[in-house]
Amino acid sequence: MSTLDRSIQARARAHLFGLLRAGFRAIPLSDATRDRWRSWFLDRHADWVPEPVRGRANHAISRRPTARSDEAAIGHVAYRTTALPETLPATLVAFYLPQFHPIPENDAWWGKGFTEWRNVSRTLPQFEGHQQPRLPADLGFYDLRTPDVMREQARLAQEYGLGAFCFYFYWFAGKTLLEMPITQWHADTSITLPFCLCWANEKWARRWDGRGHDVLIDQAHSADDDLAFIAHVARYMRNPKYLRVGDRPLLLVYRPHLLPEPVQTAARWRNWCRDNGIGEIHLAYVQGFERPDPRDIGFDAAVEFPPNMSTPPSVTARQRLVNPDFSGDVFDWRELARDMEQRPLRDYTLYPGVNPGWDNEPRRSGKGRIYLHASPRRYRDWLARTVQHRLANAPSAHRMVFINAWNEWAEGAVLEPDARLGYAWLDATRQALTRAPDVATEICSPSACVVLHAWYLDVLDEMLDAIVECGTPLRIIITTDLTKVIEVTKCIQRRGIQAEVEGFENRGRDILPFLHVANRLLDENVQLVLKLHTKKSTHRDDGNAWRGEMLTALLGPQRVDAIVNAFSTDPLVGLAAPEDHLLPVTEFIGGNADALDYLTVRTGSDAPDTNSLFASGSMFWARLEALRPLLDAHLHASEFESEQGQIDGTLAHAIERFVGLAVTHSGHRVTTVEQTLGITKTPSAQPYRYARKAP
């Protein structure tokens, strides 16, 4: 077949697929029937699904890591211990993949020594901001044949609030694969973390999702196989640390409709367990491909399995491609979280699920299905809202949340510490169990903080005078170059000022240090921050006037209390800057168009329009919650250019123009200091003194 013929055939199939999909969606069907028909079609005709839209291959500057792939990002969290409540509000159960040790079958199918780490380590970023490869941190590229690995996993899981692991169990008509870690967990009395099993009852095929005809090992369901299966797993269910619902061992099945007769299978399992000393069991299935009422198939409950059964809007077309041939799908993970946390529970027993991200590019090179913009803080909120709201009326025995997953490294669903963010995902898990994300707290002076970047130390005293003389006690954090920490410390000691001093590499001007500090303050529940820096432009002769105008507007006598109160009384105010220095982004974009485009795509924010404003000079009051689109992007320091005295066109200059966009994307608004104070000013007819409009 010629290339032209194949192209015509592909277009015809895509057109037919669109017609079939439209008709399928128009037919009134139950969720269970619709899911079953969809799975049947895709199992047989996966090649009919049209190619996804492509991203953008041509952009001015390439922005991807060039030196190393294990750099810690803004928001990296170190290991830390925190006491958990004696009684947790829910049992968190994380799915656990045991494919981190070699087995003969994988040696034969994928090459000698294959484990999931081979997929993980080969991965390359497909577009800018694509965080690949994702590499492990403290646990390393572990081998589950080493008992201490699983002991450490159990310890971490318990310290960070998890209640159990759910191991994938692979059974093929009497043959098991990857069972060794489960056997090891079962036998190790030093491990006390509960566990349960999920029978991953698909065939194994060359395709990552089990579809297709190149079958590696198949299932052979029968009545005898049902009995052999339950007899095999019974030894695990007899273990005192096996997870129970009430007093019933919990057994999951991944795809129940692959069982020829699920009702009869469930009955056989129940009868065998009653006859062999197990007693009653609690059967649940995973809503990965289908959503029947569990009672209709002889089961007791269902388990949500995000991101499956949810398709947020595609953001593929926006991506700035590194690989021009990338043909995968990119979705907005935040929309997944928003959708799932608002879903009501069903009239049957349904255990809700959450997900810390998804990216199966390691298994599908150049064709991954990627959920972009996942962040530990947003995952924390999703998990907390699930526990507090979706489970609000659940009986105590059913207060379980399933997390997909603990260690799906090749699918980007991981709680274990990684090189980029450290323990952030585990820390967010623990926070979700110990804090209420939706409780509004009144902003008052102690929750307001000044972050002052001191580069030009000859004006530091002037800046400190303005802070001290504002009349409101404020927490002060001073950032500076590593070489200037001692001098800054001496200055504040000489003046008798209480301030924290933090040193940073001279990169990213005042912006990068501010992002580091703002991220930490947000985690400390500080609500409001005043961003300042020792503004003194070497390329202008009016830098002192610029600095003075902004200090007067932001810190003038009796202003600070009024500004803080304005943020407190109006929760939609996200940023306030001096009116004379709040400018339209599109008119002062300068040489920052490409970097600004990168930031909007990287953060999943809208591109600037004529209403978009920025604080020229980068001094402003801001609600830290309103900066989350920028902070939750977890930029790397290496993305900021080395300091060479640039006056425009760097990532720091672009972020100056982007901050307002982040605020509006978060659902807040940008306003002027004067408006928050009720001051009416006549707009100046003179051109802005301190920057030139774009031509």
From Swiss-Prot:
Pfam families registered for this protein in UniProt: Glyco_tran_WbsX, RgpF
Entries under CDD domains matching the protein: Glyco_tran_WbsX
PANTHER family in alphabetical order: GLYCOSYLTRANSFERASE, RHAMNAN SYNTHESIS F
Name used for this protein in its record: Uncharacterized protein WxcX
Organism: Xanthomonas campestris pv. campestris (strain B100)
Gene for this chain: wxcX
